Amino acid sequence: GPMGIMGPRRGPPGPPGKAGEDGHPGKPGRERGVVGPQGARGFPGTPGIPGFKGIRGHNGIDGIKGQPGAPGVKGEPGAPGENGTPGQAGARGIPGERGRVGAPGPAGARGSDGSVGPVGPAGPIGSAGPPGFPGAPGPKGEIGPVGNPGPAGPAGPRGEVGIPGVSGPVGPPGNPGANGIPGAKGAAGIPGVAGAPGIPGPRGIPGPVGAAGATGARGIVGEPGPAGTKGESGNKGEPGSAGPQGPPGPSGEEGKRGPNGEAGSAGPTGPPGIRGSRGIPGADGRAGVMGPPGSRGASGPAGVRGPNGDSGRPGEPGIMGPRGFPGSPGNVGPAGKEGPAGIPGIDGRPGPAGPAGARGEPGNIGFPGPKGPTGDPGKGPPGFQGIPGPAGTAGEAGKPGERGIPGEFGIPGPAGARGERGPPGESGAAGPAGPIGSRGPSGPPGPDGAKGEPGVVGAPGTAGPSGPSGIPGERGAAGIPGPKGEKGETGIRGAPGAVGAPGPAGANGDRGEAGPAGPAGPAGPRGSPGERGEVGPAGPNGFAGPAGAAGQPGAKGERKGPKGENGPVGPTGPVGSAGPAGPNGPPGPAGSRGDGGPPGATGFPGAAGRTGPPGPAGITGPPGPPGAAGKEGIRGDQGPVGRAGETGASGPPGFAGEKGPNGEAGTAGAPGIPGPQGIIGAPGIIGIPGSRGERGIPGVAGSVGEPGPIGIAGPPGARGPPGAVGSPGVNGAPGEAGRDGNPGNDGPPGRGYPGNSGPVGAAGAPGSPGPVGPTGKHGNRGEPGPVGSVGPAGAVGPRGPSGPQGIRGDKGEPGDKGPRGIPGIKGHNGIQGIPGIAGQHGDQGAPGSVGPAGPRGPAGPTGPAGKDGRIGHPGSVGPAGIRGSQGSQGPAGPPGPPGPPGPPGPS
């Protein structure tokens, strides 16, 4: 420590002081204290040697304070102690709040089509436009079936007339579009929030006729009725330019056969027409009204009626004809390839419940839900007690462990002390669904719908092989809708009481007979969500009972987090998108060709080519606007009941949405008297199935409603996949049947052991539903009692009214791809198209590059001798010659002449 008083005097090192309190001891100087080795410090300089460790008080006067010694080495950490024993598991923490529901996944596969809605009234017939100038021939529509000749009015906007406008060659039929997804029949109601598709319920009594919707997918094509007598042939109008395609007409019910036209005056007999290609299958719509016979020339013998062609683009809706008789059933065509997934259809009405699914794993226990009103005691004998599951393991102390799968319940031990609340554990996997408890009483039936006309009974066709499941079957014609019952006011829903912890569910009892379904009241406003109940394990679904008539769908219940109240209902949504289009559209109109000359005489129709194979499915277009409502057509006979689609597999259970407060209960309308069962019409010919769409991801399914009694059923729509069963809340004690009292607060949980199951008694007859009591007030939330053993399942009560449709579930995982459909029948070849307009001449091309020289030719023959040439120019001077050699000496010359005289001599 610092030096004591000793200060600088360096005493002999004292015995090592006891280590000073660890406190101020500076680093103990290195002096010999026990202190660990001094650091490098030499002797601490100034600091004297620590004296005896002085009294450890404050050190006396501090001598000069030594510099602190170097820090001693830190000792090693001690060994860790043993872990304590885990404490007891704390009491269950309050479950954390439920997470929010995630955003909806991608859209699920298209749900099954809803049932066919009532047929809307036919839209008003548009007036024919004035004859246009003859345009270039529009693309040829498919040749419709050869009907009675209509009036040859001016070619109005209706471009797709079967008879070609210009009497040119018959254009090839357009490729058949893929079958569209059937639109809703009639104006679609406002689509509820799309819940998972419910299991299609029984067909409800058809509602009133809605406005005409877009034309649905091909209905089942009926057999052609007998041809009326042929009217006079109309004169051929000038070809109009092709009008825009009208909105699809509503699918009417099949029309009755129209009256025969008057016989035209007999002209010379023309040659029999060539058999036309198949007409476009009508929607199961009403037949258009036959126009008056035109003045076409003398009628020839009627041509053979060709098979109906695949559907071309729909023309404007024709005037509805009187109702034809149902045709006999056709054969089932092979299934087409899968098409892409369609847009989800509007939710269909709930179908009959499917067979029970396997029991799922137990779900996590959620917060207790509100206590529901007491249901009637079930009538059936108690079921056998299920085997207890194994007990869960103890979690680590303190923290709540993740939730294990609930074990079997042991005999309850005495209650331990309540542990502190641990943080909420994560939810465990869902437990198996418990059995479904007995049904509550049904609401009173709604008022009777009007009775539909009975359809004629057609001969039943042979059933075709079932298509792969999942693809919705074709829709049959809708039965005649009864009027809607009056909506009662919605009662105020009390807030839900707290639910105790759920016990494991027992097995499902048998389904009782379904009572008649009343029409649904309007949905009440959405209440605020109650607390989330704990999810009990879902039990297996029972088998579906016979399908009852569907009530009008109630408002959708909340499915996801707390939702706001619903706003007012908006206008009718757009019609569902059309099905995938075939890739080849008909040729566009040719460019303008100048004014047309007067029309030529009508040629005989060319032979119909065979229909080409369907093109691949196009991408689904956006939904078109709803068509105008047509006038009300004559009500058609009820169409045949189609086969029920196969039950889809159940989707995984969705999380239960929080329970919103209930809307006010509406007063129930008086029950309608069910109309007599209509005679089932014969099945129409099944069109070529469209390509199979990719399998959509299964949506999370809503709960299955129970089927009501079977109404006048149209064919059931395809069955949607069943939704997952929601977890049952804890059941309250059974109240007396009839009107529900307010639920009392939950009593303390009972503790007895489960008794043995008694023998199974005979199932009691279903009681009649009592009137619906007012909703009780919210009870206080009881502490959750220990989970009791699963009691025997009660008998299934009478069918309750259909619940509101759930919100569209989250998108399920994509299902496996379905089996490949049967290849479609090969279509006929199309008719030869009109010759195209000649193209313009192209510009003259640039000169080509010079080619290589050709090989040398052989020598030519010798030519004739030439004429004499002109004289040439003088040649140039040649070079100097070589110098010659020296010549030899010549001969002596002759003597010379005499010389001149010499000068005179000297004197």
From Swiss-Prot:
InterPro entries, per the entry: Collagen (IPR008160), Collagen_Structural_Proteins (IPR050938)
Modified residues (4-hydroxyproline): 272
Main location per the UniProt record: secreted
Residue ranges with Basic and acidic residues bias: 19-33, 808-819
Annotated spans, Disordered: 1-183, 199-907
PTM-bearing positions, type Deamidated asparagine: 260
Cellular localization per UniProt: Secreted; Secreted, Extracellular space; Secreted, Extracellular space, Extracellular matrix
Protein keywords: Calcium, Collagen, Extinct organism protein, Extracellular matrix, Hydroxylation, Repeat, Secreted
PTM remark: Prolines at the third position of the tripeptide repeating unit (G-X-Y) are hydroxylated in some or all of the chains.
Tissue distribution of the protein: Forms the fibrils of tendon, ligaments and bones. In bones, the fibrils are mineralized with calcium hydroxyapatite.
Biased composition (Gly residues): 591-600
GO cellular component annotations of the record: collagen trimer; extracellular region
Biased composition (Pro residues): 892-907
Pfam families given in the database record: Collagen
Biased composition (Low complexity): 101-130, 155-169, 206-221, 272-281, 292-307, 340-362, 424-441, 453-475, 495-507, 535-555, 566-581, 601-611, 664-691, 706-745, 756-766, 783-804
Miscellaneous comment: These protein fragments were extracted from fossils. The tryptic peptides required multiple purification steps in order to eliminate contaminants and to increase the concentration of peptidic material.
Family per similarity comment: Belongs to the fibrillar collagen family.
Function of the protein: Type I collagen is a member of group I collagen (fibrillar forming collagen).
PANTHER family: COLLAGEN ALPHA-1(XXIII) CHAIN-LIKE ISOFORM X2, SI:CH211-266K2.1
Subunit text: Trimers of one alpha 2(I) and two alpha 1(I) chains. Interacts (via C-terminus) with TMEM131 (via PapD-L domain); the interaction is direct and is involved in assembly and TRAPPIII ER-to-Golgi transport complex-dependent secretion of collagen.
Name of the protein in its database record: Collagen alpha-2(I) chain
Organism listed in the record: Macrauchenia sp
Gene from which the chain derives: COL1A2
